[in-house]
Regions:
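N-terminal Rossmann-like dinucleotide-binding module
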Residues: 1-56
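C-terminal helix-rich "cap/oligomerization" subdomain common to oxidoreductases
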Residues: 1-7, 12-13, 76-78, 114, ...
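Active-site loop of classical SDR/Rossmann-like NAD(P)-dependent oxidoreductases
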Residues: 18, 47, 281, 301-313
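Predominantly a Rossmann-like dinucleotide-binding segment in NAD(P)-dependent oxidoreductases
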Residues: 18, 133-234, 349
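Beta-loop-alpha module in the N-terminal Rossmann-like domain of NAD(P)-dependent dehydrogenases
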Residues: 56-119
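Hydrophobic residues in well-ordered beta-strands that form the structural core
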Residues: 102, 127-129, 158, 255, ...
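Rossmann-fold dehydrogenase core element
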Residues: 115-132, 152-157
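Contiguous beta-strand/loop segments that form the cofactor/metal-binding neighborhood of enzyme cores
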Residues: 193-285, 312-323
Length: 355
């Protein structure tokens, strides 16, 4: 008879919106399947942590993550805090002997990311940044097409995610010391990660960019239905960013992201271009040409399964079976290097070399 493995023990640090809506539902699903046991939830807001604990089987609640880590043994720690706590919470989890899944962005700067990777290597534990868009069916389909060679030699990518009005009106997304930046660090990190992954994770060598703050700090700013109003004087991040990134081998990427811009409607799009064909997200398809026709194949039947669900289940499986994670921390470090270079480029008005 095969001995039944004990459920993995899971702890979650930070029980705000991202944990409540996109992480904990899937850990509870795994708990119902008998694969994990949610042991502890940590948050500085008592009502928030207790509300989520009530949905679990027997999770204890804590206001201090170090107390939670010292009183329990965890196989997995899921870090869902504000950006500025990602590094310290991740390193604490790794040092306590847990494998760590941490929400994007990886951290506030390259130095913090490097410290997280060093801690994971020292502890010999898994570390993965929650780049859920890689796990979506549409991304998996595009990766399949590119990997098949149908696009030929990939040479450039273009991505944009422009919200007409969509500054997050919850948490502290709009405060630089808490989050680092605005849409570049919030939604730009998703688009850049997906682009670079689809291109085969080339090494970035230089970036130029510009960030703007034109709407978020205005008293007359209309933010549509994006949470509760915030004091305009608190808004000190960008609400629009544009960038051009160069990679080894001559590959390039262009990007535009916004929380607020005077466009017709929200735009989310991406193209990865090769010399034989290209792929895009809206519409989701493969585009090519031969000597007498333009060809395109589109897909609208792909699974609607949430990328967050696939991401959580993937990380659980990696820990269960000692498998490599899809989002390698070194890849996330490269994305952070690009982000840091874009902000520096904007400040200095010149291209920044990425080492």
């Amino acid at each position: 008879m095969v001995k039944q493995k004990s459920p993995l023990t899971v702890g979650v640090i930070g029980t705000g919106a991202i944990a409540r809506d996109q992480h904990l539902p899937y850990w509870r699903e795994l708990e119902e399947e008998g694969r994990v046991h949610i042991v502890g939830l940590c948050d500085i807001v008592k009502a928030r942590r207790e509300e989520e604990a009530a949905k679990c089987r027997a999770a204890k609640t804590y206001s201090d993550m170090r107390k939670m880590l010292s009183e329990n043994r965890f196989d997995i720690i899921d870090v869902c805090t504000q950006n500025r706590f990602h590094s310290v919470a991740t390193i604490a989890g790794l040092q306590a002997g847990a494998n760590v899944l941490v929400e994007k962005p990886m951290a506030m700067n390259v130095k913090e990311c490097e410290a997280m990777i060093a801690a994971a290597k020292k502890a010999r534990k898994k570390l993965m940044v929650a780049q859920h868009m890689r796990f979506e069916a549409r991304a998996q389909k595009l990766k399949e097409v590119i990997t098949s060679g149908a696009c030929g030699e990939i040479y450039t990518a273009e991505t944009k995610w422009l919200r007409r009005r969509g500054v997050p009106g919850w948490g502290k997304f709009h405060i630089a010391k808490e989050s680092l930046g605005g849409p570049l660090i919030d939604i730009g990190v998703h688009m850049m990660d997906l682009c670079v992954w689809l291109m085969g994770c080339p090494k970035p060598v230089a970036a130029s960019g510009k960030v703007y703050r034109k709407f978020g700090d205005r008293k007359d700013f209309f933010n549509a239905d994006w949470g509760t109003p915030y004091p305009p004087k608190e808004f000190d991040v960008e609400d629009y960013a544009t960038a051009f990134v160069r990679f080894e081998g001559g590959l390039t990427m262009q990007m535009q992201v916004s929380w607020a811009a005077n466009v017709h409607d929200e735009i989310e799009n991406m193209y990865i271009l090769g010399d034989k064909g290209g792929v895009g997200i809206n519409p989701l398809g493969f585009f090519s040409a031969d000597h007498d026709s333009l060809n395109h194949t589109t897909w609208d039947w792909l699974s609607a399964e949430d990328g967050h669900r696939r991401e959580v289940r993937h990380f659980c499986e990696c820990v269960e079976q000692n498998l490599p994670v899809m989002v390698k921390p070194e890849e996330s470090l490269r994305i952070q290097k690009i982000i840091d270079a874009i902000y520096l480029s904007s400040a200095k008005n010149r291209e920044i070399v990425i080492k």
